[in-house]
Structures are given as C-alpha cells and as structure tokens.
C-alpha cells in the first residue's frame, strides 16, 4: 500500500470513470501501455484485484470501489489544500468552479470577464447542463456555486436571490397573435406549445402558473434546448414560454416576438446556491461578493 502513488490513483479514477483503458489514456494524454503498467503497479501495491475486464468493459471489484472512493477523498483533500494555498497567496491563483442551468449561459459568462481581469491567475470552470444534471452536481458537491431558477427543496443549501428572471411567451413574427394585445390565457391554451422537458425550472414554473389558473397547457413538443426551441418557434411549429434572457442573442426586435399575454411576463428569479456545509474558499467568496456588486451588468435592462 505504501508504494501506491497519487498518479496511479488518478489513472485508476479515470479508468473507473470512462470504463476503458483506452479512453482513460486519451483523457490523461498517456499511452495505453503506460496506463496498463500503472494499474499493474497499483494492483500489486494494494494486494488484491481492483477490476475485472469482460470484453472491452471494465468492472470494479469491491476492493476497486473502495480504492476509487479513497482516491476521490485524496483528490478532494488536495483540492482543498490548493485552495488554502491560493487563499494565502492573496488570490494570485486558485480555482473557481461554477455550474448553471442552460439558460444561465446567456448571462453568467458576461460576469466572468471583468472578474478575470481583476484576478488573472484564477482558473475558472463553468459547467452548463439541464436542471437534473446541475442538481446532481450540487448533490455531489462538484462545484463552488450554482445558478438555478428554482432551488431544490430537498437539500440543505444556502440560497441567495440574485436577478429577476422574467418568463415570456414567444412566437414567430408571422404568427397572427403578434398583432394582438391583452391575449387571454384561455386563448393561449389553444395554441400548440413547444416547451422544455419535464423537470426543467422553466417548465415547472409555467406548469404551476397554469395550474393556479385552472388551465392545462397544450404541449405538443418537448425540446431540451432553448436554442432548438427558438428555431422550432421561428419555423412556425408553435409558440413557447422561455426566459427573456434566452432572447439575448436575437434581441427583442429579432425574428421572434414577445406576445402580450395576460399574466405575463411571469416574474421569477435567479438564485445562487451552494451546500450549507460547504466552506467557501476565498476565491469563491470573493466571486460571490463580486456578483452582488456587479449584478446590474447582466440585468435585463442592460442586455436589451
């Protein structure tokens, strides 16, 4: 056991993650023979088989799973040590790990430019995914801060209200409803809706609104991408309800129109959340403070 190295643990974790020696080698920029040799040495150091290879697939043994868990703990401890050292060096270097649901991609990157200029030595990672993917990252404590439109109720987390997040009804400019004013919700339910997938923050907020008004949405198509939804709306397949931020690239005078519908825009919010048990590094805390000092830079008024 004493002869096991950090590099061997890193290689083993990559194999477990990818399920393949070849993919692990590609991920770590190593040759496959090097990966195989590292695993032989680690297995010898541990003293028991760590994996089984059936066909091209790698399966961890019980001992292998224990080693994987230990390697994750080792990596976490080293990351914490790196953050401490960065803290002591006065933010001259360090890591900032952020994650946001897909709609956040329209404004979160805007926040990073000036911060990066102030702290050029900080390495920033921004993960973008759907709500379920981001919640899984949160549950596994993979990042420092998370941007969500609807915080989960089943996790012990800190929740900071950040920005307004108006949800609007959009249609192609050729749609007959574009010329109308004060469109009733009853008329809206007769229109084919193109919506995000069930479980997304936007979908949940809209479903709640329609339920409160005792109406049922006429969802004819589900798409897990805001950009694809906009293309479908532009193509005349229906109307949709999205965050106004999702129109940042086209602008409010672009090919898609915001309809004047009763009860809209739905005034929702963006939240920044993180685990209550998490001790934010100085890097993460500095960025959090920076966000609330510069939130006007990504307000709806500034973007549009």
From Swiss-Prot:
Family stated for the protein in its record: Belongs to the LysR transcriptional regulatory family.
GO molecular function, one term: transcription cis-regulatory region binding
Residue ranges flagged as DNA-binding region: 21-40
Chief location: cytoplasm
Function of the molecule: Activates transcription of the cmpABCD operon under carbon dioxide-limited conditions. Specifically binds to the cmpR-cmpA intergenic region.
Cross-referenced Pfam families: HTH_1, LysR_substrate
Keyword Transcription: yes
Keyword field contains DNA-binding: yes
Protein's UniProt name: HTH-type transcriptional activator CmpR
Keywords of the record: Activator, Cytoplasm, DNA-binding, Transcription, Transcription regulation
PROSITE patterns documented for this protein: HTH_LYSR
Residue span(s) of domain HTH lysR-type: 1-61
């Amino acid at each position: 056991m004493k002869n096991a190295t950090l590099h061997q643990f890193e290689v083993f974790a990559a194999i477990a993650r990818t399920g393949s020696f070849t993919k692990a080698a590609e991920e770590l920029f190593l040759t496959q023979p090097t990966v195989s040799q590292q695993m032989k040495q680690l297995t010898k150091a541990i003293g028991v088989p760590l994996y089984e290879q059936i066909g091209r697939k790698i399966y961890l043994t019980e001992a292998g799973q224990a080693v994987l868990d230990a390697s994750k703990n080792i990596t976490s401890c080293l990351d914490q040590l790196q953050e401490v050292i960065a803290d002591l060096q006065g933010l001259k270097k360090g890591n900032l790990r952020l994650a946001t649901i897909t709609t956040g991609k329209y404004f979160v990157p805007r926040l990073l430019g000036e911060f990066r200029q102030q702290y050029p030595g900080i390495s920033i990672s921004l993960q973008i995914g759907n709500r379920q993917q981001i919640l899984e990252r949160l549950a596994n404590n993979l990042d420092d801060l998370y941007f969500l439109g609807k915080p989960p109720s089943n996790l012990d987390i800190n929740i900071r209200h950040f920005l307004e997040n108006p949800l609007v009804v959009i249609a192609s400019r050729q749609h007959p409803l574009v010329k109308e004013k004060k469109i009733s919700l009853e008329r809206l339910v007769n229109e084919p809706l193109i919506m995000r997938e069930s479980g997304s923050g936007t979908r949940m907020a809209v479903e709640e609104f329609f339920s409160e008004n005792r109406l049922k949405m006429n969802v004819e198509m589900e798409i897990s991408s805001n950009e694809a939804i906009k293309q479908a709306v532009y193509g005349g397949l229906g109307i949709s309800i999205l965050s106004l931020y999702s129109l940042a690239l086209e602008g409010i005078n672009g090919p898609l129109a915001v309809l004047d519908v009763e009860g809209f825009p739905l005034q929702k919010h963006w939240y920044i959340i993180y685990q209550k048990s998490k001790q934010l590094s100085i890097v993460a805390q500095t960025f959090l403070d920076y966000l609330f000092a510069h939130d006007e830079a990504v307000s709806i008024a500034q973007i549009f």
